[in-house]
Amino acid sequence: MKFNENWLREWINPKITSVSLRNQIVESGIEIESIHEFNPIFDGFLVGKIVECINPCKGNNLKILKVDVGYKKLLNIVCGASNCRNNIKVVVATIDSILPNGSKIKIKKIKEKLSEGMICSFFELGLFNFCKDIIELPEDIPIGKKINDLFLLKKDTFIKVAVTPNRPDGLSILGIARNIAAINNLKKIRLKKRILPTTIEDQFPITINTEKQSVNYFGRIIQNVNLNVDTPFWMKKKLFFCDLLSDNIIENILNYILIEIGQPLNILNADKIDDVIEIRMAIKKEFLILKNDTRIVLDKDILVFSDKTKILFIPGNINNSDLEPNKNTKNIFLTSYLVDKKSILNILKKIDSNNILDYYSHGVDASLQKYAIEYATYLIVKICGGKIGPINTKKSNFNSLSCSNKIKLYHQNFNKCIDSFVDSSIISNILLCLEYKVNFHKKYWYVFPPSWRFDILIEEDVIGDILRIYNYNNIPLTPLKQNYYFNSKNKDLKSPLLDEAAVLLINRGYYEIITYSFINPSLQDDIIPNNNQILISNPISKDFSSMRLSLWPGLLKTVSYNKNRQQESMRFFERGLCFSIDESQILGIRQEMFLGGVISGFYSKENWFSVRRKVDFYDLKGDLESLLEVICGLNKFEIRHQNILGLHPEQSAKIYLDNKYIGSLGKIHPKIEKKLNLYNSTFLFELSLNYISKLKFYNTEEISKYPTSRRDIAILVSKDIPFLDIITVCKDFFVNKKVEINLFDVYSCKEFDNRKKSLGISFVFQNFKKNLKENEVNLMLHDCIKILKKKFQVVLRK
């Protein structure tokens, strides 16, 4: 919402600077998005009076004027404006004055007639682009006065605020003024009476034919209005700052009331309403044609306002094009309606939001509806004339639309919340300034929030509301009363674990990304087949209608997006929650913290010293081993080849930590690769961090001063036996000794009948207390080979 500071000061004018006023708006919980100064400088622009207006040629609009601007002689000016006439006061740009667009006024001939200045419209002043008629000033403004001195063009500031859904009071001048009054402990804002007497008895009967919907409806007929009049300048200026100014007087009046008191109103052509107003649910396939000839087919859950034969409008001021008033309309129907938020949500599913729907989504104060009707009537009749009919009212389930929460606020809870003492009299005064109804007892208050605060539901809401007026800066800073000692063994290490992993991956060339937890269910089905999806009841769209079971869909979507933008080498990782069905959990849903990554395309950038190659399984496996080495230790995890749905059957594996499954890695399945238009070299990994409960803590020890002793062996073993199983047995055998085991050769040939493979394994022995003797090393190695022969039927090659 945008507004100008002078408009706000018409409602509440504390003796503080503009900067302080803006700071108080922020302190009240309303964010200021932008501030712009309005300080027009119109040198040489004077108030003049047309004393003579001659039209020498009837076929031409040009008029020859004599204008008095307070000089010794009258100015000759040529003007073509349609509203140019004798005895009106105007704005005159004199010779050598400069227009806002940079043009300089000079003496010139127009149609052989000398012109010594320009009669200005708002358009020439750079204010209202569609106002091409010359400005007509009030009669009481003296001739020759500089227009910079006019009140209507004085310096001002316009402010744009952003309002959260829980603060509808910030969507109007009235709401902001109430907050400023409370902060400065000023008198409550009182609404001026705007009631005009009725002069006719005409009205439309109103019926509500829906039991489930909550509706509060006001309507009034106003006859014999003149909608061909110009909008008053004071209203134009305010709406200009709000970016809501139009050339339609009805739109301007409705927007003025919307910004000033936060009440949406609607106006229809009364002559086209057939006898009655009926509020009902739409009939299947019923439609509405809008002003731009757009046709909207309505569902049965859409609330409509109709007459006997047609729909008039639906909530959000989405009107039937036939009912829109124009400048020739003489009789209008002024309405105010309030419906429940469910009705608004049903409409938002069907069409895009607009300014009026935004107000209804935030919440509208039901207690101001009648006042808004009276205020709009007052403005319409004062500006456009007309005869006023009575206000007709109809309500259904009104209690659900009004704010009537009774909340118990304990003094002790308030002080405990801020860990300080605030006297009960101060709290009571703030509550009264905020216009709560208060019943005070010895230890607590019964409070009733004002009608415009729909967000105040519980005691903590009231405490927060009091504190924004009390000012958080007034709460003293106090140290913790208790010393806390954290045991690293019991402390939750998931956050530092993630940070440690993130730093390592970034150092290896990965970029961290953040994707939505809501994803497209069809994409999830492709990547994770045969899954139980968690679908969202009211999704933003179909692409965001399922909770993610894995980080992979988001990672692959990011790779696809970047590939389509000429990126040839990509490494991404993400950390976030994934969700799955688990009846043993609260709400039947389990959430786990996952870490996932993807590599795709070329391994490195193009260079002169090596041939570019695409990434492969072992590139990802190497990154993952480095990661697991940091977070849980190299000896604790295993990577086992297993088929995984969504991954290539020959290039996929599962990761185990202490024999518990914690994740997967592998190449994306060719079908998915083709569907997502990915490189033929895309590899993924994912780790569940719920099982990784602690970081690896390193123990330091002295380096042995004794030399190492190395032995190499070559063994024949079945191709079906993974090397991981062999090295695990060897490590278990040497668990209490310092032995480093490494695979340095793999060999296979026809001599082995293609059923066996030869493995070259090195053993490096070392002792911290003595120099190992040859027979000791040979004996340990002999015993290890003996176990391998027994368990895997290995044959020692010579």
UniProtKB/Swiss-Prot annotation:
Mg(2+) binds at D455, D461, D465. It is found in: Cytoplasm. Residues 402-477 form the B5 domain. Residues 704-797 form the FDX-ACB domain. Its EC number is 6.1.1.20. Binds 2 magnesium ions per tetramer. CDD domains: PheRS_beta_core (cd00769), tRNA_bind_bactPheRS (cd02796). Its main location: cytoplasm. One of its GO terms (biological process) is phenylalanyl-tRNA aminoacylation. One of its GO terms (cellular component) is phenylalanine-tRNA ligase complex. It comes from the Bacteria. Its cofactor is Mg(2+). One of its GO terms (molecular function) is magnesium ion binding. Residues 39-148 form the tRNA-binding domain. Disulfide bonds: none annotated. Tetramer of two alpha and two beta subunits. Belongs to the phenylalanyl-tRNA synthetase beta subunit family. Type 1 subfamily. This is Phenylalanine--tRNA ligase beta subunit. It comes from Buchnera aphidicola subsp. Schizaphis graminum (strain Sg). The gene is pheT.
